[in-house]
């Protein structure tokens, strides 16, 4: 039995699962259990560093300027004009995605996902809306999916004004530029899981494109284990002129949007307000997005989104998919949702001249580190539970074994209830049950999978098993 130095009641006990299905899983010898590790951010692999170096701020700048040059990309704007309007922007994005797909040796497919949106808020008449969706199929776990998006529609001061110029450089050509650059650098590479690169429309009118995309995955019963939207990621300068060029915010909800009344009852009984799947996803991003390699600090914000605002991750949260939103550190509202104009010598409007393109490239590197690490590591464990059939000061955890072909085993992680990050981990081997000599009253536990390359997936927060 292992007993961490200087810490009572932390002996690790392991054993085979009790179920017949898990009886073939390897049992760990308690005497061989290692001391718990103190967790630290993971340095990127040589392969990941090479990927990050390929991200080019000049390409990102060219994308933002090209999208802004379509005049307006309002969802209700012209769809057939080849030079101006959302239709021209849609076709240009589609052409870029198809260009990148040609480097994928057939692994990337590109679809134009179009439908007629019925009349609703900010959509006065039936309107065709289109998402451009590129799917890079995984080689070993193709059914496990991670989505990254930006919205290519734009708006002026009046959300219904579909004729005035609305260049939408920061909101959200910057996010689309991130998605396109990610598609470009990842298309030639083989990933374990499937990655989806989506440029969605209808965001400014009511998150219509993201809702359609999320519902399409729900209808397919797709295993979407993570989604990131990049929305307003173009500037490092606040409205007072101060700059923060090396910080990106990542918004991650606590209590799940999709939580049922029964799940709420359990949460109130055992805790876990800070342990939603989206929070675990955000912790994973901070762990793998090394600032030395990305040039960026990820500031996780414990909110679903900015105060009283929303974004394209929310339709995914509503359908119980883990999701988060990347947004620049401080928004400048003179360059967001504004008519292009000059008032008292001050320029208003969301113009490319107010973007910081090396900053956007660093945002893309954070996304790339997260997506690559998610796709190459094992998925989030399923069925993680804490056994509560008997009162005891030890904690017994069970979970289901994953199907990844390179799965090496599992780690149990824990932290103090007041700590925002996981602080300790111990490798328990290729088992589906273990007992830790720590009270579940005093710490929070989690379980994560590890593959033979040593890559660790996101943590699963266990529910009680009665």
Predicted regions: what is each one?
Residues 68, 233-251, 300-378:
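Active-site-adjacent mobile loop/cap segments within catalytic or ligand-binding domains
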Residues 148, 154, 159-207, 367:
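Alpha-helical metal-binding/catalytic segments enriched in His/Glu/Asp
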Residues 1-7, 16-25, 32:
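N-terminal secretory signal peptides
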Residues 437-455:
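Beta-strand-rich modules
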Residues 59-137:
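A non-catalytic alpha/beta surface segment that caps or lines the substrate-entry region
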Residues 393-405:
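Conserved aromatic anchor
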Residues 452-466:
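Extracellular fibronectin type III
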Residues 200-311, 319:
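Metal-dependent peptidase/peptidase-like ectodomains
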